[in-house]
Regions:
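Conserved phosphate- and dinucleotide-binding cores of soluble alpha/beta proteins
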Residues: 77-178
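N-terminal active-site beta-alpha-beta segment that forms phosphate/nucleotide-binding
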Residues: 1-109
């Protein structure tokens, strides 16, 4: 966390652009796609530039790709995903994260491509999150999805105590920093 917190805004944006290029290539391999993302907290990988392209119709107009974009919201003790039509339809949660308003349409994740924030990954691609267990619980129930861990190079191969609920990523998008 300390290393991530010390990154400059320029380093975060450069790393984010690198990962967005990889997600862009993933999107272009599909005719339709459900993409579930997250809003960045602190120096997490920032996908807002990608979300703006999606919401502006870039992929539909230029590649005839239908995209449903969803973001998570914590509701009580669980996380749910909601369709996003505008980044203006978000509000700050008690955790300080921008989330969809409750008037948004819920998405039940199935065959979605899910971009997952994390603190680190172990050698088996299991995710160390922030301790709330929201992603682990959600994707423990909704297993028919592709999970993509978005990491800086220094977040790889971290040693941490793994429990039975820690989910493994299917794929990693990694950005080298420095």
């Amino acid at each position: 966390m300390e290393k991530r917190n010390s990154l400059s805004r320029e380093e975060v944006l450069s790393a984010s652009e690198s990962i967005i290029r990889e997600i862009d290539a993933l999107i272009k391999k599909n005719k339709s796609i459900v993409l579930l993302g997250f809003m960045p907290l602190g120096n997490e990988i920032d996908l807002r530039a990608l979300y703006k392209k999606i919401l502006a119709g870039y992929y539909k107009e230029n590649f005839d790709i239908d995209i449903i974009l969803g973001l998570p919201r914590v509701c009580g003790k669980e996380m749910r995903f909601f369709k996003i039509d505008s980044l203006d339809n978000l509000e700050k949660s008690k955790f300080g994260i921008m989330e969809p308003r409750l008037n948004s349409e819920e998405i039940i994740a199935k065959n979605a491509h899910v971009m997952v924030p994390l603190i680190g990954l172990d050698k088996d691609k299991r995710r160390l999150g922030f301790g709330g267990g929201f992603y682990d619980k959600y994707f423990g129930k909704h297993k028919d999805n592709k999970l993509y861990g978005l990491v800086y190079d220094f977040q790889m191969n971290i040693d941490f105590e793994v429990n039975e609920y820690d989910i493994a990523m299917d794929h990693i998008f990694m950005a080298k920093v420095g």
